Amino acid sequence: MSMPGLGYLILTFVVLLLLVLFFSFVPVGLWISAAAADVRVGIFYMIGMKLRRVPPHRIVNALIKAEKAGLEISIDKLEAHYLAGGNVDRVIDALIAAQRAGIDLVFERAAAIDLAGRNVLEAVQMSVNPKVIETPVVAGVAQDGIELRAKARVTVRADINRLVGGAGEDTIIARVGEGVVSTIGSAASHKEVLENPDMISRTVLAKGLDAGTAFEIVSIDIADVDVGANIGARLRADQAEAEKVMAQAKAEERRAMAVAEEQEMRAETQRMRAKVVEAEAEVPRALAQALREGRIGVMEYLMMQNLQADTAMREALGGGQRGGQPGGQDQK
């Protein structure tokens, strides 16, 4: 191959490479789409977005959508919102939906809601079509001790002005559950609640539970009310069982004290008997001492012995007569 032919080949390759690099870096197709939609975006501005690491197709497509919907939004605001971490497409869709529904919503407000982590499009849709939140089963006890289990359906509408900083669905569910428990607990009888379930919804709705939340409560409907356990009877049974245990404990304490007192009395009796035996053992010693010292004579001692023997004989005879009295009567 000659040198001129090789040069032309290299030149062609370089030109093709430059064209590929140009079309891959410069969004010509996107620029043509914007021009066809009568959206004025300079091609050098798109190159600048590339350099700022902003996908041009996201910004330009969102701008085209906004222009076709009649929204006046600058491309700088869209790019700034993207750089702040927002979802540009969702914000534009929310603005279009709000415009169609007649809701007053500006770009700055929608962008703030989106950056706050809220789904601004869903919020606009909930403003138009309220959402139904079903609470879990809530149990409450009426004043007669009967447990009631209720389930409520809460219809809420999103409040655009309170989305930033307002509480979410969990707060609504918790407040409604608290109101249901309070209403059931204030009822004198569970039959009142069963006969008029709407008394729960009226009472709860009148408390203004949507204060400080991102929603407006439209209605509260009681879906189901079931009768649970007899909590009052169970509490009374538990109280009676506790009193029984306390009475048994006190009785056991008194029995233990009586047993201890009996043991003490037995020990005291044994001590007294020991003293009597000890005193009886001192009598012969005292007699012997008296005989030695001459305070008592031998005749007196013998007379005392005879007296003791007579006394013992009479006691023996008296005991025998008492034991054999029926026999003695037969002899007579």
UniProtKB/Swiss-Prot annotation:
Q: Would you tell me the Gene Ontology cellular component terms?
A: membrane raft; plasma membrane
**Could you tell me which InterPro entries the record lists for this protein?**
FloA
> A Pfam family name for this chain?
FloA
Entry's transmembrane regions: 6-26, 28-48
Q: Which UniProt keywords apply?
A: Cell membrane, Membrane, Transmembrane, Transmembrane helix
Task: Give yes or no: UniProt keyword Cell membrane.
Answer: yes
Protein localization: Cell membrane; Membrane raft
Could you say which residues form the signal peptide? none
Q: What function is annotated for this protein?
A: Found in functional membrane microdomains (FMM) that may be equivalent to eukaryotic membrane rafts. FMMs are highly dynamic and increase in number as cells age. Flotillins are thought to be important factors in membrane fluidity.
Q: What is its quaternary makeup? A: Homooligomerizes.
What's the family?
Belongs to the flotillin-like FloA family.
Q: What is this protein called?
A: Flotillin-like protein FloA
What species was this sequence derived from? Symbiobacterium thermophilum (strain DSM 24528 / JCM 14929 / IAM 14863 / T)
